């Protein structure tokens, strides 16, 4: 044997170089073939990589253990001969564990393990591979060839679980080498293994008798079709073996096996054709049942006759009660049916099993031609019941379906006027209520209903209500400190107002942004109403007015944060010069979540903020493809060009910006239905009229400038793709793409 030679080569160093992969293979193999030591397996594992091929070789006997050869004692020889005589016809049958697909009605002995039966007891390892694909077998009977002992092997059907079949196999089915005439010498090698196996089997049988007593008495009086002549042997003394996995599977099939000789293959073939006919019958009967059920849908209260063999009558009535009653009746009747059939079969053993197989699952029929004992016959009809049950509920439900849409439509109609009412109420409340109270109601409407008719309205939609109180205090302080360009008023602003603004901003932040943190789609910010950047706009605006530190928000303000805010921020932090070069601003600590407020790690918000371009967050100025072209360039303007400082605007204008905000808000509140007195009385003190004039003039001037800038940008940028030099993120033309 070449394996012997190889063994002597490898064995010396094999133990040293067992890498974990080999070791795991060897472990699984030793579990499958306990009588192989790891030394025996090492060579095979080294020679063949694939576990399946190794198992194949061992089970087919192409590879054997290097073992002592003993001559069989006379007694053993005599026993074997007797056995072989009694079993001669069975050589035409497959040893179920040997033939992978159970197909061979032809000579499957070409690779039965019995030639090298040192490995014979684990042929089922082969099964283990194939259990997932059970075939419709040409030979349905699996006959287990054990010395005079009946070990029912487990039929592999689609309904038994893979684990169940395998575990049953590996634990119990130990095919003995009974069906080879010619290999007596080789058989002698495995006698020790056989004796061990037989002892094991006896122990296991004793353990399992407790489990199987129930099945036993059902099996006793049912010798199966082919055992007409040898009914003297029943399987009562050897109950079916089941592993825990088999017991756990939903329908343990206790299928009785006989080991009596089958006279010829022709008989088998006849049986198989019978069974195919039965399949067709059962299918046809199921179809009839379905047809009847559909007709029963039209005449609901009449009774249809749905049953496997059209014997039972299940009255159909509306409602869910029908289903339950029908299920119960069917189960009861089927149990009675199967019991009757089994009695009939016991009377005439030779009768073919058509009646039972009609009720059985088709899978079971093709897999095993043996009678099901009672408990199987009871469990098998369940799938068919299940197939009928879904059809039964359809009958009462169908007439109801047309009603359901009507019901759905009715509630919808009242809802719509309700919504309109709510909107009207909200609109009526706006002029009446104080702004702090109106804030929440107006939020949604501000986003979607207000037009940007004025340049600053675009940026200040919601701010007008929410920050009014702050701005009032701010304006009041401006009057106390008449020098309009001083930075003190803002930094001295009362902490209370700062707190209010922060609360509002936080509330709004959570209201919109956190719902769908990473969600974006390309045109998302096209509509002015979309509340994405507005949150930051408020946050930063708040900071710009309440404290001087808003410079930090210069590049982190989200998309809506526009020039006016940052201009004010630059002014208040006395950083106008510094902020003119973006690099200093990056160095500021980040106080907001980096990518536009809702952190999405992938591609840095590919659509919203396309990472390298818009907001270089990380303080390295030279790293990005181009630098920020403008001082307060914010990537994604949700509002059309608000107050973008064109390069020629000086710091003087920046300083005026900060004041301009209040006046603009006050002016815009009038068209939006905010009563004028409320605006003019800020905390009980009237607005300085001179201030208001100043604001108005500047507002007009800046609007002109901006229209010009926007027109230029639109002309220049028409059709230029995204990353290029003059790209103006404030202009509407460029907005949808990136």
UniProtKB/Swiss-Prot annotation:
Biased composition (Basic and acidic residues): 69-84, 211-220, 256-291, 325-336
Amino-acid biosynthesis found in the keyword field: no
GO MF terms held by the record: DNA binding; transcription factor TFIIH holo complex binding; ubiquitin binding
Note from the entry: Present with 3380 molecules/cell in log phase SD medium.
Biased composition (Acidic residues): 298-324, 337-358
PTM note: Ubiquitinated at Lys-281 or Lys-288, and at Lys-328 or Lys-329. in a manner dependent on RSP5; ubiquitination accelerates its proteolytic processing by the proteasome. Proteolytically cleaved by the proteasome in response to transcription stress; the resulting N-terminal form constitutes the activated nuclear form and the C-terminal portion is degraded.
Main localization category: cytoplasm
Similarity-based family: Belongs to the DEF1 family.
Domain of life: Eukaryota
Cellular compartments annotated: Cytoplasm; Nucleus; Chromosome, Telomere
Low complexity: compositionally biased ranges: 103-121, 224-237, 380-455, 467-498, 660-688
Protein name per the record: RNA polymerase II degradation factor 1
Keyword field: Chromosome, Cytoplasm, DNA damage, DNA repair, DNA-binding, Nucleus, Phosphoprotein, Telomere, Ubl conjugation, Ubl conjugation pathway
Modified residues (Phosphoserine): 260, 273, 307, 646
GO cellular component, one term: chromosome, telomeric region
Domain notes: The C-terminal part appears to promote nuclear export.
Role, per record: Recruits the ubiquitination machinery to RNA polymerase II for polyubiquitination, removal and degradation, when the transcription-coupled repair (TCR) factor RAD26 fails to efficiently displace stalled RNA polymerase II. Also involved in telomere length regulation. Binds DNA.
